[in-house]
């Protein structure tokens, strides 16, 4: 129906749409070639369960979580936090204090 309406208004548009539909129908109705049935042989399939259970703490994926590094003194970090708590040194911000 749309094709007939376009054909009445624009003869060239109707013809080109008709050719487009004809080519599209031919491409869709043509039989597709069958793919060869290539499947993985049974001896290559992976086992569903692990043969040996993992020892220790594991997550859902069977991975052990990383443990944090052993706590020790961190002098540079502790100094930075101490300075941060003390507040800024205003002498660093004003150049004319010593003048």
UniProtKB/Swiss-Prot annotation:
Organs and tissues of expression: Expressed in round spermatids (at protein level).
Disordered as annotated region, ranges: 60-90
One Pfam family named in its UniProt record: Frey
Annotated GO MF terms: protein-macromolecule adaptor activity
A GO-annotated cellular component: endoplasmic reticulum membrane
Signal peptide: none
Chain ranges passing through the membrane: 10-29
Superkingdom of origin: Eukaryota
Compartment(s) of residence: Endoplasmic reticulum membrane
Subunit structure: Interacts with SPPL2C (via active sites); the interaction stabilizes FREY1 protein and inhibits SPPL2C proteolytic activity. Interacts with IZUMO1; the interaction retains IZUMO1 at the endoplasmic reticulum membrane and coordinates IZUMO1 complex assembly.
Name assigned to this protein: Protein Frey
Gene: Frey1
């Amino acid at each position: 129906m749309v094709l007939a309406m376009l054909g009445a208004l624009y003869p060239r548009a109707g013809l080109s749409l008709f050719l487009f539909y004809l080519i599209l129908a031919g491409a869709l109705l043509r039989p597709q070639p069958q793919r060869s049935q290539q499947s993985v042989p049974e001896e290559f399939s992976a086992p569903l369960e692990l043969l040996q259970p993992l020892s220790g703490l594991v997550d859902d994926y069977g991975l052990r979580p990383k443990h944090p590094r052993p706590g020790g003194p961190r002098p540079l970090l502790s100094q930075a936090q101490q300075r941060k708590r003390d507040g800024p040194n205003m002498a660093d911000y004003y150049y004319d204090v010593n003048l």
